[in-house]
């Protein structure tokens, strides 16, 4: 069953668009309506004065209402899988019997103590979505993905292929180093997927590490004339880093068009790429890893 992309869902109706000026105008209109008709025009003129003490009271009251409505919005988002974060997401995960994984345990022997590195909200949210797949006993792709991802916090991604009937190949991408899964991690995943309540009797499961395809990015930015170039370069690097991180998953291609799009931030006139020179197309058992990226400015064309 395909996973719904929560980022593509429309904003929920329960979350209200807030506007201070609209709330203040409603407050003023309500106050004016409380006066007799022959006094309403004079009160309305008074409320147009910013220095009027009554206006200050209404502004303070409107601001408090704005804060309260925002708190209601936050409370509504906190119970939605698409919006919840942190402890709120942990509570939602408990409803699906899916807990957040520990990537690196806490170390109390250091000074100061090193806190544990936990699974990110994005990865945890995906596993929660797949929780019902984990109930399947028919060996579905989703079930193998769920149990594989839940086996260990070091698992960054899982792919499931069937090269022949009753043969299942599980490729594991690790969060450690460049993504190659260690034998220790493969053993943990193998044990998790061979449980009697997970693997159908007829399935023969092979667990292997993802094949890592390394690449580099070397780009030159040509800018429109302006006083400073470094903020523009920094913005381009930030978007490029986000793209590199997002594509470090199984089966995600590295496309030149996407690199150009990431680097074309406000202020960039054109981009020249020295590397890569072609798209890097991957299958579901492969993952990319950027060993180095270099973004420099080449001045202005004008």
From Swiss-Prot:
Superkingdom field: Viruses
User: What's this protein's name?
Assistant: Baseplate protein J
Localization of this protein = Virion
Main location class: virion
Species of origin reads Escherichia phage P2 (Bacteriophage P2)
Q: Which family does it belong to?
A: Belongs to the P2likevirus gpJ protein family.
Q: Which PANTHER family match?
A: FELS-2 PROPHAGE PROTEIN (PTHR35862:SF1)
Q: Which gene encodes it?
A: J
Q: What induces it?
A: Expressed in the late phase of the viral replicative cycle.
- Could you tell me the keywords of this UniProt record? Late protein, Viral baseplate protein, Viral tail protein, Virion
Q: Which Gene Ontology terms of cellular component type are present?
A: virus tail, baseplate
Asked if the Swiss-Prot or TrEMBL record annotates the protein with the keyword Transport, the reply is no
């Amino acid at each position: 069953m395909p996973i719904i992309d929560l980022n593509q869902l429309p904003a929920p109706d329960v979350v209200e668009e807030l506007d201070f000026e609209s709330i203040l105008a409603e407050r003023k209109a309500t106050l004016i309506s409380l006066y007799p008709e022959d006094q309403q025009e004079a009160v309305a003129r008074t409320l147009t004065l910013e220095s009027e003490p009554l206006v200050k009271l209404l502004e303070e009251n409107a601001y408090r209402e704005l804060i309260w409505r925002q708190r209601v919005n936050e409370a509504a988002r906190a119970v939605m899988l698409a919006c919840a974060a942190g402890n709120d997401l942990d509570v939602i995960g408990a409803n699906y019997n899916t807990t957040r994984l520990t990537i690196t345990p806490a170390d109390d022997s250091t000074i100061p103590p090193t806190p544990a590195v936990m699974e990110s909200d994005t990865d945890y949210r995906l596993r929660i979505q797949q929780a019902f797949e984990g109930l399947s006993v028919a060996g579905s792709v989703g079930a193998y993905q769920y149990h594989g991802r839940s086996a260990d916090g070091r698992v960054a991604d899982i792919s499931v292929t069937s090269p022949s009937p009753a043969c299942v190949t599980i490729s594991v991408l690790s969060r450690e180093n460049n993504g190659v899964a260690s034998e220790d991690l493969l053993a943990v995943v193998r044990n998790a997927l061979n449980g009697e309540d997970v693997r159908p009797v007829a399935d023969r499961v092979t667990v292997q590490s993802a094949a890592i395809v390394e690449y580099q990015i070397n780009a030159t930015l040509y800018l429109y004339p302006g006083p400073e170039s470094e903020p523009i370069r920094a913005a381009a690097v930030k978007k490029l880093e986000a793209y590199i991180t997002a594509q470090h998953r199984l089966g995600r291609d590295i496309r030149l068009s996407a690199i150009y799009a990431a680097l074309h931030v406000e202020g960039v006139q054109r981009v020249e790429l020295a590397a890569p020179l072609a798209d890097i197309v991957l299958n579901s058992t492969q993952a990319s890893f950027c060993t180095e990226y270099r973004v420099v400015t080449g001045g202005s064309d004008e």
